[in-house]
Regions:
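Glycine-rich catalytic cores of cysteine/serine-nucleophile enzymes that process amide/ester linkages
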Residues: 1-43
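A structural motif
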Residues: 42-56
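Activation targets extended, charge/polar-rich intrinsically disordered C-terminal tails
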Residues: 56-128
Length: 128
């Protein structure tokens, strides 16, 4: 995924961070900061099988997104990745809470961070 070597049947978390040095894409940082999140029950996610062509689109989006700014934050990154391969598009929003609501509105979502794939992502944190 992106520039991270992901083994078969493995998981990774990918996000942009503005409160780190350097800023930009980090792998598995969310996984490692799970105990610091204020309310993990507010976390929403969807899982899906994807084709090779969709994976290529996702990788291209990740590889061209190693930046962070107020108008290019983690929410914008998540929307770009979602829209690069999703059948359902999400319109622009500026906060994680707004994005959460848009994901909920797409239907068939899950909540929390007890998902085994999320919990089993490697502990290592790697900058893009």
């Amino acid at each position: 995924m992106g520039r991270y070597k992901l083994n078969a049947n493995a998981s990774v978390t990918i996000g942009t961070w503005g409160n780190t040095t350097p800023t930009g894409i980090w792998y598995n940082k969310e996984r490692n900061k799970i105990s610091e999140f204020q309310n993990n029950n507010n976390t929403v996610y969807k899982t899906a099988s994807i084709s090779t062509s969709k994976l290529s689109k996702i990788n291209s989006t990740i590889n061209s997104s190693d930046t962070w700014g107020l108008l290019n934050n983690c929410t914008h990154f998540a929307i770009r990745v979602w829209n690069s391969a999703g059948d359902t598009q999400i319109s622009s929003c500026t906060t994680p809470a707004q994005l959460r609501n848009k994901i909920i509105n797409t239907g068939s979502y899950s909540t929390g961070t007890t998902n085994a794939a999320f919990r089993n992502a490697p502990n290592s944190v790697k900058k893009h």
